[in-house]
Amino acid sequence: MDQEQEFLQSLSGLRDQLLDVLKDYWIFSIPYSLGEVAIAGALAKSFKQQYGGPLAFLVDPAKMGVAQLFADQVDVAVPVPMHLLRNLNRRGFLSPETFRRGSVQDAYEIHGAKLNFVSLVTLRNQHPDRGLPVTDVFRFAMRLPWEAPLHPGRPDKEALEQAERIAASVGMEPGNSVILFPGNNTNLPAPSVFWKRVAKEAAAAGKRVFVNVSGAALLPDDLDVPGIPVELNDIPQAIALCEIAGRIVAGSNGFLMTALLTETRFGLDVILTDAFDPTASGRHYQPMPIRSGSLFLQAPEIKEDIDRPYREWEVPSSVDTESIAVDLVRAWSAGNGSPS
């Protein structure tokens, strides 16, 4: 038996094991990033209202924290490495046409049915009046009506208590602090000069400034951004700590989508850039329409439901980013930061 055959045999064994353990569950495989797990989690209640339970999610171990935010609706979350989940689909081990308990469904792309839903999302990003937003792609894959509502998740008591301990240990002023997230995962991070100016202006405005650099694959060249360092690796704790701080500034990514789909109210300033690296290595950047990073394009219903200070800022590579940083901080005192 060659290596390929051994791998296929292991995938078959994994599928059979999952189906045996979860034979009475609706099972959704979500082999993607934080935001995708959060969207599926936010639709879990609507799914169970439509089809009943119990409901199981298969997610990468690093994304289990997102599933925990929706523990009141997702009955069990099973950690399975992302590459195995993706190969279960790509190698034809899933049966998307069999929609019932005890059959694994992919909550986003159904390669086995020769459908690539990401193409619909790409069209949406390029032309906002065309294609489907990410949230509707999930509704379609989960066989929900277009009007199925998103239900926010929440950090549990343990995460809230741990966040309070962290906040006290680093001297965070509740409601008067800002956490900067200079890094990103696929979208190009804004340059360090932008982040330094945001930190400077925020401090001058009386904010306690914190800088998180953990959990990001892509970082600006110079990370000497003034601020108190914090490491936010646990997703529920990180969201709870952001709520204590009162505001964050970050590039468009799955963490922000996750945060928007929780019962929190901290302010969000989202940085949109004009390139991305699908390999997340920092060596293969490709240009992209700057608005494609807009969370409102990906989940337009959140613009109607949002109840927090929120702004999106376009920071293209060819402009004076320091002036944008100044405007960003000044906007905090200009109003409540209604969606833009």
Q: What is each of the regions a protein language model found here?
A:
Residues D2-D129, Q237-R247, F255-T258:
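Active-site and donor-binding regions of nucleotide-sugar-utilizing enzymes
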Residues I27-F28, A56-F57, L180, V211, ...:
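Structural beta-sheet core signal
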Residues V37-Q50, N185-N212, W313:
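Conserved catalytic-core segment of nucleotide-activated headgroup transferases in glycan assembly
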Residues G65, A190-F276:
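Donor-binding and catalytic core of enzymes assembling or modifying cell-surface/extracellular glycoconjugates
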Residues F70-V80, L219-L232, H284-A299, D307-W313:
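Active-site regions of enzymes building and remodeling cell-envelope glycoconjugates
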Residues V80-R101, N125, P155-L160, L218, ...:
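A short acidic, often aromatic-flanked loop/helix-cap motif at beta-alpha or helix-coil junctions
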Residues N116-P189:
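Mid-sequence helix-capping/hinge segment at a functional interface
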Residues L260-S340:
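Nucleotide-sugar donor-binding patch of glycosyltransferase catalytic domains
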